[in-house]
Amino acid sequence: MQKYTFLSRLINTGCVAVIRGENLQAAIRTCDAVIAGGITGIEFTFTIPHADKALKELTEKYDSQKSIVIGAGTVLDAVTARLAILAGAKFIVSPSFNPDVAKICNLYAIPYTPGVFTPTEIQQALEAGVDLVKIFPGSVAGLPMIQALKGPFPTLAIMPTGGVSLDNMEAWFSAGATLVGAGSNLVEAAAHGNFDQVTATALKDRKKVDQIKQSRR
């Protein structure tokens, strides 16, 4: 049940912020700024030095707020997946499908969201127990691909990541996205130390996601 509790919370966020950074403290501040703006799905990437330490700090900090779901991104192998899970990650994201990562996530009852790009990769992921896939990079795949995949995989839960912005967010949902992943368009101001701007952008994205969800009820 734990896996589906975390998965449900993740999907309910509507939008997952992809957090990167050159150093630990900047990445943590970016995460805090995004959450302050109402984006409560957080993919904390393991390209950040000592990401497991930051992940532990963040998951403990926000543990009492169940609407906030913090997971690990750019997880390339099973060792890193286990490290992230033990640090408190509530979901695992990778740029491509890795069967060993899928096994670890299944063992710990943690949702695994691999990046996929072809029907073959999608089928392999589904057969390994994956419930939500990431279409990456979304900017290359495009809206028509999301729509086309819904033909052979009508129940597929999809999170496009890469190329998602405030201006095209509604189009992604209309094409069949279950939720979206937002990266540089959301957090780019953090690179210049402008965390207030990150919060302001997150507020706009949160409002847009809520409007889209409301219109589909």
Briefly describe each language-model feature range.
Residues 1-79, 83-87, 107, 155, ...:
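Conserved N-terminal beta1-alpha1 strand-loop-helix module at the mouth
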Residues 20-23, 72-78, 94-98, 114-119, ...:
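Glycine-rich beta-to-alpha transition loops that act as phosphate-gripper elements at the mouths
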Residues 44-45, 85-87, 108, 118, ...:
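Glycine/Thr-rich beta-alpha phosphate-binding loop at enzyme active sites
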